[in-house]
Amino acid sequence: MAIRLILEAPDPRLRTISTPVEAVDDELRALIADMFETMYDAPGIGLAAIQVGVPKRVLVIDLQEEEDAEGKPIRHPRVFINPELFDPSEEQSVYNEGCLSVPEQYAEVERPAVIHARWLDEQGAKHEERLEGLLATCLQHEMDHLEGILFIDHLSRLKREMVMKKLEKARRARKAA
């Protein structure tokens, strides 16, 4: 396992449309292990393969919503290979979203509150599930990455430009430090 470099906006590779996974094999499982290690290290709750420079339709999510007796997050890692969404609800929900590729920037994004999804796991098993709440939002956010879309693309032009200016200012400050 290895921690990989997370691409940051405005890196043009983030705009790449990811291709379907042809085979669930040990090479893919190694990528998935690296993705989890990278996501936990960042820290984050979701990561798409394109964010580490691999244009494949793979993403990992772990909401880590529970804690153990010592206050450490309880991990519930989930792998989504070639995910598909269908039958989104008309009802919308709004979450204050962030992104490891747009570090330290957050904005409210409206998405369907309930979705249905189908995908393969890291063993190649098929799954289909109704998702809601933060998991539904996170899956939609990560699936946007597979299409070359960032959460800031859901914002008005003015808000998007403000986020990008803040991002560039923070990047310059990190380099100067």
UniProtKB/Swiss-Prot annotation:
Originating organism: Rhizorhabdus wittichii (strain DSM 6014 / CCUG 31198 / JCM 15750 / NBRC 105917 / EY 4224 / RW1) (Sphingomonas wittichii)
NCBIfam families (UniProt xref): pept_deformyl (TIGR00079), PRK00150.1-3 (NF001159)
Active site: E142
Family in the record: Belongs to the polypeptide deformylase family.
Lineage: Bacteria, Pseudomonadati, Pseudomonadota, Alphaproteobacteria, Sphingomonadales
Protein name from the UniProt record: Peptide deformylase
Principal EC category: hydrolase
Binding site for Fe cation: C99, H141, H145
Organism domain of life: Bacteria
